[in-house]
Amino acid sequence: MGYLFTSESVSEGHPDKVADQISDAVLDKLLAYDPSSKVACETLVTTGQVVLAGEVKTKAYVDLQLIAREVIKKIGYTKGEYMFESNSCGVLSAIHEQSPDINRGVERQDPMEQGAGDQGMMFGYATNETENYMPLSLDLAHRILQVLADIRREGKVMTYLRPDAKSQVTIEYDDNGTPVRIDTIVVSTQHDDFIQPEDDSQAAQLKADEEMLAIIRRDVIEILMPRVIASIHHDKVLALFNDKIIYHVNPTGKFVIGGPHGDTGLTGRKIIVDTYGGKGAHGGGAFSGKDPSKVDRSAAYAARHIAKNMVAAGVADEMLVQVSYAIGVARPINIFVDTYGRSHVNMTDGEIARVIDQLFDLRPKAIEERLKLRNPIYQETAAYGHMGREPQVVTKKFFSRYEGDKTVDVELFTWEKLDYVDKIKAAFGL
């Protein structure tokens, strides 16, 4: 008998994602002007207010207020009625210097022996059920919200859309773990109060709310979903769409109050959305606002890079990779592999892990250099997932009245590159 599996995603306008994007925008600007910056930036967003806190060691000086306001404006919080607006919200900073006790564990005379910025375990996961080696349920959940954001920005249809939104996708699998159909799609999107009640009575209000909901539900099914389907170019995924999909659209009936006014947002509260949607495992460490000396981030990217290349090379159909560190120690304590019984090589998972240890240098500095993590590449990761994205080179411009303007070419999502497949095939005789 088969089973159902569900993953969720949240939009760039979700309050926790607003916080993530501000934290990573601060990180990017510091790295742009001082690549050696050590950063741990946390953000809180609520009604009309942004609070920044954390620890930083840098030679750069940046305008934190301006960074926060630019992010909020780009997301789309530009109207006073949202109760959180880029020009009028308060921005309070409580950022201070990094602890020298932490820094002494990271800095080394030999840069390659740079210690891990903290203890912990990090996981990478990959599966061959999608072209980007991501869980299908999460990939679709991200895609729905990316298309919804495109529609909102175009402003031609569904003109009532506001920035906050969530999605959830449930996939039915057979006994072999193969997706067979999409079972349920949930879309909750913030919207304008675009139909006013005829009078102040409760019945009139309910009637207006029901009319709005009917329009939103129709538009999600007839406008949003066809565009989502049109963006998919994988025949096996397209075949999973069917006329029996259950749609839950704004199930509470109304979603006018949203964003940071509806829910307080914090950096690092969407770690499953950021990674694998509940598949694989998670060590608990969030990513956004952390420079790559924090192995919570850099080692998680490295583990994903390993898992994706291993699956792409044909070592297994699905793979989980764990690495762990002690603070101040360069080399990982362990490498663990789980192929879920879906390996294609005549080796135990422990033996596979030992080959990985020989192929990949997992010291923090080596990870930084291999994946080019000392570049300002992080704001793009802070919405719609850190994994499964398309590697690309982009030109980024930074403006500073203190440091001068700067233009840099950077490579995004380097951990998604399939650049170790040939080495892995050679090592495993594939």
Q: Where would I find each of the regions flagged by the language model?
A:
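N-terminal, positively charged regions that mediate nucleic acid binding
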Residues: M1-A40, V45, V421, A427
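Glycine-rich, mobile lid/loop segments that gate access to catalytic sites or pores
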Residues: T6, L66, K73-I257, G388, ...
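Conserved phosphate/anionic-ligand binding catalytic regions in large, soluble enzymes, centered on
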Residues: E8-V10, H14-A19, G115-T130, V256-A281, ...
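Alpha-helical support elements that line or immediately flank enzyme active sites
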Residues: E12-L31, E129-A149, K290-G314
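Structured core elements
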Residues: A40, V51, L92, M122, ...
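Short, charge-patterned binding micro-sites
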Residues: A40-T58, I327-R331
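Internal helix-turn-beta structural module
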Residues: T46, A316-E318, Y325-L430
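C-terminal catalytic subdomain
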Residues: R269-I271, Y276-L320, R331-D338
